[in-house]
Amino acid sequence: MSISFSNFDFINSTIQNYLNRKLKSYGDLKYAYLIMNKKKPTDVVIISNYPSEWVEIYRSNNYQHIDPVILTAINKISPFSWDDDLVISSKLKFSRIFNLSKEYDIVNGYTFVLHDPGNNLATLSFMFEENRSGELEEIVQNNKEKLQMLLISAHEKLTSLYREMSKNKNNSKSQEPNIFSQRENEILYWASMGKTYQEIALILGITTSTVKFHIGNVVKKLGVLNAKHAIRLGVEMNLIKPVEPVKARS
């Protein structure tokens, strides 16, 4: 199924938190996770821990059309270093994108590639600053398999969130995006009101194990560590819709 990606702040924030947590053990790695529709390259999402100005300049100028890294990745399935001949020896003129990189002290980098069934290109690029280029590249080179799997898991999480949001939006009269099913929202709502799992089970007429099952799904969707984090994130991002008290039901 083809998924239309948009820049939803909540989903971007969820994936960025996931990437930040997974990459923490590797030190101060600067990254950019980019998703581009290969049939419509103007549709692009960028999630990065680099300065927001860099991301905005890149996106507003549609630099994905001239970025040699992206143009190389379109025809690759394996990860590559930016100083490979494929990138540096390009005969095309990419002065604008290279000038932007120099402004932010980016001298080299490494990109992991994924082509998904929806005809999207997903890349996870690590940008190396001049004073630490060799050190950072060694970290990436020594962990290539893990970082490739991180791209796969992050992209799977992203597509799952968009798919769930699209499904719930189509099944609802409301046009507001919602990534939670009705049951998940009910459970999250009562949990956010301070109810225990046992109390929620009584309110909704279901078992405690069913409550835990749905909470587990919510934790996976949001890419957080535990239920408390999921509830807090749901409240902070206004993702939980109010529900009316109901009689016990099967």
From Swiss-Prot:
Pfam families: Autoind_bind, GerE. InterPro entries: Sig_transdc_resp-reg_C-effctor (IPR016032), TF_LuxR_autoind-bd_dom (IPR005143), TF_LuxR_autoind-bd_dom_sf (IPR036693), Tscrpt_reg_LuxR_C (IPR000792), WH-like_DNA-bd_sf (IPR036388). CDD domains: LuxR_C_like. The keyword DNA-binding applies. The keyword Flavoprotein does not apply. Functions as a potential ohlL-responsive transcriptional regulator. This is Transcriptional activator protein EchR. It comes from Dickeya chrysanthemi. The lineage of its organism: Bacteria, Pseudomonadati, Pseudomonadota, Gammaproteobacteria, Enterobacterales.
